[in-house]
Amino acid sequence: MAKNNKKIKTSLNIIALNKKARHNYFIEQTLEAGLSLEGWEVKSLRDSKVQIKESYVILKNNELFLFGAHISPLKSVSTHVNSDSTRTRKLLLNRLEINRIKDNINQKGATIVPLKLYWARGKVKLEIGMAKGKKSHDKRQDIKLKDWQRDKQRTLKETNKIFNF
């Protein structure tokens, strides 16, 4: 009897990250949403030709849409297809999730930001975060904390080198 020696791929392949979102916002809760995409967009996502740093999510007519995400079309895209790289894309969520998001948005200073774009079970998913904006002193505090952690790790590494020879 032959054994099936297929390698199992990880179920989570990150396409794009929005690192600025965690710097500019306090992320309170995250959700996974599907995306309504066209064929050429999926091909571009397979080549990681996407930018979500300047994108944002908006609620319109009880539906969520992703604005400002730039998906670069491939050179091999058909000429008869109009490839708009920054078109608005609908997010696919349950009604219960949309209602929960709507309740959170109604709070002062609350917003929805895209955090990462990834493959899950062969489909493109977008992780969105319900967030509140940080003030400049909060950002400075985070930078100080990161610097302190980095310096602490550096000194631990140096002391380990001295004692371990």
Swiss-Prot record:
- Asked if the keyword Cytoplasm belongs to this entry, the reply reads yes
Q: Name one GO molecular function term.
A: RNA binding
Which UniProt keywords are listed? Cytoplasm, RNA-binding
Q: Give the record's GO biological process terms.
A: trans-translation
> Which Pfam families does this UniProt record tie to the protein?
SmpB (PF01668)
Q: Which GO terms describe its cellular component?
A: cytosol
Subcellular location per the Swiss-Prot or TrEMBL entry: Cytoplasm
Q: Which domain of life is it from?
A: Bacteria
- Answer whether the UniProt record assigns the keyword Cytoplasm to this protein: yes
Main location per UniProt? Answer: cytoplasm
Family indicated by similarity = Belongs to the SmpB family.
> What does this protein's UniProt record list under function?
Required for rescue of stalled ribosomes mediated by trans-translation. Binds to transfer-messenger RNA (tmRNA), required for stable association of tmRNA with ribosomes. tmRNA and SmpB together mimic tRNA shape, replacing the anticodon stem-loop with SmpB. tmRNA is encoded by the ssrA gene; the 2 termini fold to resemble tRNA(Ala) and it encodes a 'tag peptide', a short internal open reading frame. During trans-translation Ala-aminoacylated tmRNA acts like a tRNA, entering the A-site of stalled ribosomes, displacing the stalled mRNA.
What name does the UniProt record give this protein?
A: SsrA-binding protein
> Native species of this protein?
Ruthia magnifica subsp. Calyptogena magnifica
Q: What is the lineage of its organism?
A: Bacteria, Pseudomonadati, Pseudomonadota, Gammaproteobacteria, Candidatus Pseudothioglobaceae
**Which gene name does the record give?**
smpB
